UniProtKB/Swiss-Prot annotation:
Catalyzes the attachment of proline to tRNA(Pro) in a two-step reaction: proline is first activated by ATP to form Pro-AMP and then transferred to the acceptor end of tRNA(Pro). As ProRS can inadvertently accommodate and process non-cognate amino acids such as alanine and cysteine, to avoid such errors it has two additional distinct editing activities against alanine. One activity is designated as 'pretransfer' editing and involves the tRNA(Pro)-independent hydrolysis of activated Ala-AMP. It comes from the Bacteria. One of its GO terms (molecular function) is catalytic activity, acting on a protein. Consists of three domains: the N-terminal catalytic domain, the editing domain and the C-terminal anticodon-binding domain. Keywords: Aminoacyl-tRNA synthetase, ATP-binding, Cytoplasm, Ligase, Nucleotide-binding, Protein biosynthesis. GO terms for biological process: prolyl-tRNA aminoacylation. This is Proline--tRNA ligase. Its EC number is 6.1.1.15. PANTHER family: MITOCHONDRIAL RIBOSOME PROTEIN L39/PROLYL-TRNA LIGASE FAMILY MEMBER (PTHR42753), PROLINE--TRNA LIGASE (PTHR42753:SF2). The gene is proS. Homodimer.
Length: 618
């Protein structure tokens, strides 16, 4: 395809509003353009990459018997009222009315629609299982769209739904999807982990997230590609090397979620769901009497600990939440942080929000900084992290401004429900006892759920089982963020390309090093001088030969300076660059492998054979 015929509006500079490298490069390389806040147009290059990813998905889903269909994006609100999500989904749901004043939504996901379609068509267990999916635009009214395609108001998603007559059958399909997702993301060239995930608004029970890992840009050998003019990093002057490190550091922010994983086992989980090895300890110290002490101007745990000369691990942090309009007290060891997802899941709450200062004062009789679990009103619900029950003679707020209590002992002085509600910390033991936890940043690219009967119960989707009994259909749900795949791939495959000019100056610029499977084209064929007829003829022949061998070819036929062509080529990021330059009359062309920066001159007649050898090596 001729580059002059495509819309590829590259920019000379990084966009000033971009915060992550994937967003910056997608805009600068002419892949996407923002139409309005959180809404993007996918230009030809991005669209080709997305279509290649769709092909990979379709091939893998066919292997597990998943069937593609297409549901509407505009949905009646009545279906969501049936499931109960119309009221509970939150402000992210796009709600609208038609000319008849009927309520509709723009679908952020399609559980209700697929459940209804199957409910109306399937009556017997003999018609199951069903395994359906679609690839479609979804809509979510994000309060603060950000990070390019990672947090948008319109996005492309693959959402699949399976329907079963029992949980054993669901387990089989769930495992099929897990393996299919691993195959898809592996083929897409992603470094990823399957981790324990949170079902969230989807209503799932068991779930697994697939996270594309986005490591820090500190390893020069990974993130920097040297031109053939530079033999090694050792040849780069120290001051230039420091500039390169600074450029990498400028784009260090990467990923949207933190994951915790074991250094010695397969354990991995989203930070929201991660836990650590816990060993209860028996109390050995005698319990002191409760005592009220004045702690003037002490509002935080560290201030209280310093004032009373105790370690923060001997203090109790007391928080108040409102869960579905009911107050809940949460307790932590003083140096720990609350994990609101764990707390919300334990409470099985639809809504969980921190209480306001006014609400806290009404409940405790004191303001923030002086709250504690002792002498609360009868019937108060207290949920404490499991570490709290190991404390002896702890310090907690006295529910009196400017005062705390010492000698606080769980069990004697208050009763609580003990459960894991804290955020894990790096370096703690993995919950399986093998290795310690390390943190990494990542981008969620896929999520699979065992929905069970969450939707079939609320929407009356039932079948007759083998015994003639009416039972709810058991469901699974399987999503892939198609548009965010583009961001994830670029986050992992962005590279800083460094070259040395004939005058000895060092220059560097960001570009993309697309994996072959997702690159919009396989080969970037560049004619240095489009006015040279010999070069033009050779380019045309090479283009035809490459296409005949199955290569997707982007031919740069523009009448532009060669420097601009090479800069655009680095930006666009195709795996192979073939340059028809000054030696065209001799039948000599240059091949450059983008991943390594290696280049070689070959006779044009040997181009295909050489490419086959080089691509096998890389």
């Amino acid at each position: 395809m001729k580059q002059s015929k495509l819309l590829i509006p590259t920019l000379r500079e990084m966009p000033s509003d971009a915060q992550v490298i994937s967003h910056a490069l997608m805009v600068r390389a002419g892949y996407v353009r923002q139409v309005s806040a959180g809404i993007y147009a996918y230009l030809p290059l991005a669209n080709r990459t997305i279509e290649k990813f769709k092909t990979i998905m379709r091939e893998e889903f066919e292997k597990i018997g998943a069937v593609e269909m297409l549901a509407p994006a505009l949905l009646t609100a009545d279906l969501w009222r049936e499931s109960g999500r119309y009221e509970t989904y939150g402000e992210d749901l796009y709600k609208l009315k038609n000319r008849d004043n009927s309520d509709f939504i723009l679908g952020p996901t399609h559980e209700e629609t697929f459940t209804t379609l199957v409910r109306d068509a399937v009556k017997s267990y003999k018609q199951l299982p069903l395994n359906l999916y679609q690839i479609q635009s979804k809509y979510r009214d994000e309060k603060r769209p950000r990070n390019g395609l990672l947090r948008t108001r319109e996005f492309i998603m693959k959402d699949g739904y399976s329907f079963h007559h029992n949980y054993e059958d669901l387990d089989v399909t769930y495992e099929d999807y897990r393996q299919a997702y691993e195959a898809i993301f592996t083929r897409a060239g992603l470094d990823f982990k399957g981790i324990i995930g949170d079902g969230g608004a989807m209503g799932g029970k068991d779930s697994q997230e697939f996270m594309a890992i986005t490591p820090a840009r500190t390893d020069l050998d990974r993130w920097v590609v040297l031109d053939k003019s530079i033999a090694s990093m050792d040849d780069i002057p120290k001051e230039v090397l420091e500039d390169i490190k600074a450029e990498l550091a400028a784009w260090m922010i990467s990923g949207e979620d933190t994951i915790a994983y074991s250094t010695e086992s397969s354990y991995a989980a989203n930070l929201e769901m991660a836990t650590n090895e816990y060993k209860p300890s028996s109390k050995v110290a005698a319990e002191d009497a409760l005592a009220e002490v004045e702690t003037p101007h002490c509002k935080t745990i560290d201030e209280v600990a310093a004032f009373l000369s105790v370690d923060e691990t001997q203090t109790i942090k007391t928080l108040l939440f409102v869960a579905d309009n009911e107050p809940v007290v949460a307790l932590l060891v003083g140096n720990d942080h609350i994990n609101t997802v764990k707390l919300k899941n334990y409470l099985a709450a639809d809504f969980l929000e921190p209480a306001s200062e006014e609400e806290a004062r009404a409940f405790f009789g004191a303001g923030f900084g002086s709250l504690g679990p002792v002498n609360l009103a009868q019937g108060s619900r207290i949920v404490a992290d499991r570490k709290v029950q190991n404390l002896t003679n702890a310090v907690a707020g006295a529910n009196k401004d400017g005062f705390h209590m010492t000698g606080v002992n769980p069990g004697r002085d208050f009763q609580a429900e003990y459960v894991d509600i804290r955020e894990v910390k790096e370096g703690e033991m993995s919950p399986d006892g093998h290795g310690v936890l390390q943190f990494a940043r990542g981008i969620e690219v896929g999520h699979i759920f065992k929905l069970g009967t969450r939707y079939s119960d609320s929407m009356g989707a039932t079948i007759l089982d083998e015994n003639g009994r009416t039972v709810p259909i058991v469901m699974g749900c399987y999503g892939i963020g198609v548009s965010r795949i583009l961001s994830a791939v670029i986050e992992q495959h962005a590279r800083l390309f460094v070259n040395k000019t004939p005058k000895g100056d060092y220059r560097y610029a960001w570009g993309i090093n697309f994996p072959k499977e997702l690159a919009p084209f396989d080969v970037h064929l560049i004619t240095v001088n489009v006015k040279d007829q010999v070069a033009q003829d050779l380019t045309a022949k090479l283009e035809a030969d490459l296409m005949a061998k199955g290569y997707d070819v982007l031919t740069d036929d523009r009448n532009e300076r060669v420097g601009s062509k090479f800069s655009d080529s680095d930006l666009i990021g195709l795996p192979i660059r073939v340059t028809v330059g000054k030696k065209a009359a001799e039948g000599i062309v240059e091949i450059k492998i983008k991943a390594t920066g290696d280049s070689i001159e070959v006779n044009a007649e040997n181009l295909i054979e050489t490419l086959e050898i080089l691509t096998k090596e890389h």
